[in-house]
């Protein structure tokens, strides 16, 4: 599941040549690749897509990310250099960024180092992510079934003497063992 093409189709509507994705959730939406925290940047353009990450995730990115060029960032090749090279290759002059998620420090850094005009464009992603395609609906149903199965099992295991922490840990284990990729949030167990 990746949505590079959907994002690229919306660029003209917003007057953009490309879209910079730094937020983990939006990188996942675009690429289908789940990395941790701030470890990655995706660039979507009409002429091609790019995914940049560090050495910890480069092999996994090569295996998971499709329809994008993958490159590794390091001290000699910082994100801004990789982004600038990709923008030059794809003729990006107006670059959308996630203004609702990007820190002021990151914005200042990108605005000083990138050779383009940065344009606030979180709305582009919000409008796309609001509607789900058939594959996303199927995944949501599968996730619900995994959660329900784990809940059914954990209800049988709750008894006096079992702590909330133990129940939460067991519930998380049951969901992962049942096929969940990750938790959206830590389980909340209260008595």
Model-identified regions with their sequence ranges:
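A generic "binding-loop/recognition-motif" signal
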Residues: 25, 57, 124
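Compact, glycine/acidic-enriched structural inserts
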Residues: 47, 52-81, 85
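Flexible, acidic/His-enriched mid-domain "rim/lid" segments that flank
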Residues: 78-183
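Glycine-rich nucleotide phosphate-binding loop and flanking beta-alpha elements
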Residues: 26-28, 59, 103
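Short glycine-/acidic-enriched loop or helix-start segments at secondary-structure transitions
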Residues: 30-32, 61, 106-108
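Terminal domain-start leader segments
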Residues: 1-50, 80-81, 88-91, 112, ...
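Acidic, glycine-rich loop-and-beta core segments that form the ion-binding/anion-interacting portion
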Residues: 182-191
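Structural motif
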Residues: 22-24, 53-55, 74, 97-102
């Amino acid at each position: 599941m990746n949505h590079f093409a959907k994002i690229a189709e919306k660029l003209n509507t917003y007057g953009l040549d490309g879209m910079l994705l730094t937020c983990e959730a939006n990188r996942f939406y675009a690429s289908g690749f789940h990395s941790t925290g701030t470890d990655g940047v995706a660039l979507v353009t009409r002429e091609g897509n790019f995914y940049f990450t560090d050495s910890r995730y480069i092999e996994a990115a090569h295996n998971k990310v499709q329809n994008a060029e993958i490159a590794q960032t390091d001290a000699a090749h910082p994100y801004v250099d990789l982004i600038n090279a990709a923008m030059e290759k794809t003729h990006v002059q107006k670059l959308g960024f996630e203004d609702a998620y990007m820190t002021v420090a990151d914005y200042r850094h990108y605005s000083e180092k990138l050779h383009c005009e940065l344009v606030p464009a979180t709305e582009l992603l919000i409008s796309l992510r609001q509607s789900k395609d058939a594959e996303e609906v199927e995944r949501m149903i599968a996730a619900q079934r995994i959660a329900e199965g784990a809940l059914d099992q954990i209800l049988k295991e709750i008894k006096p003497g079992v702590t909330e922490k133990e129940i939460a840990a067991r519930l998380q284990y049951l969901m992962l063992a049942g096929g969940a990729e990750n938790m959206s949030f830590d389980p909340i167990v209260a008595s």
